[in-house]
């Protein structure tokens, strides 16, 4: 990937100290979305990376994964599947719970959104601990989908998400990374 393009993306992401709590350096992807050139560059890089990969579906996680997953699916000519928090999807769903730092959360997917043999790309805005994507991958695999790739705009490698997802057999694509948390 083009070094200048990757630098533009990283520079467009604002860092908010002590948000949402003291000691956290929040990486705000919405500042990238506000910058037409940076957003367009991110999408072009993702399309270029995956245009010949043979995916049949792109799955995005709630909610910022939708902002990258849906336009990517359109450009790749495949369907987009949202993975959402409980009670947000109208048809029959399956769910997967996962652990957070203090508690747990649950994600859902429509049971008919992924067919056996679908080749799926998972995408989200940011990879931290990997819990959200791990739960998403489990949902896809339970429905018979083949998922071996996950894409992110931002990765925080010090939080262990990359290693966690690689242990699940996923190849990781990231447009930028920030050290620390």
UniProtKB/Swiss-Prot annotation:
Pfam families in the cross-refs? Pribosyltran
Q: Is this entry keyworded Protein transport?
A: no
Catalyses: AMP + diphosphate = 5-phospho-alpha-D-ribose 1-diphosphate + adenine
Q: In which pathway does it act?
A: Purine metabolism; AMP biosynthesis via salvage pathway; AMP from adenine: step 1/1
InterPro entries for this protein:
Ade_phspho_trans (IPR005764), Adenine_PRTase (IPR050120), PRibTrfase_dom (IPR000836), PRTase-like (IPR029057)
GO terms for biological process?
adenine salvage; AMP salvage; purine ribonucleoside salvage
Gene3D superfamilies listed in its UniProt record: 3.40.50.2020
Q: Where in the cell is it found?
A: Cytoplasm
Q: What is its EC number?
A: 2.4.2.7
Functionally, this protein is described as follows:
Catalyzes a salvage reaction resulting in the formation of AMP, that is energically less costly than de novo synthesis.
Which family is annotated? Belongs to the purine/pyrimidine phosphoribosyltransferase family.
| PANTHER family according to UniProt | ADENINE PHOSPHORIBOSYLTRANSFERASE, PHOSPHORIBOSYLTRANSFERASE DOMAIN-CONTAINING PROTEIN
Can you say what this protein is called? Adenine phosphoribosyltransferase
Q: Which gene encodes it?
A: apt
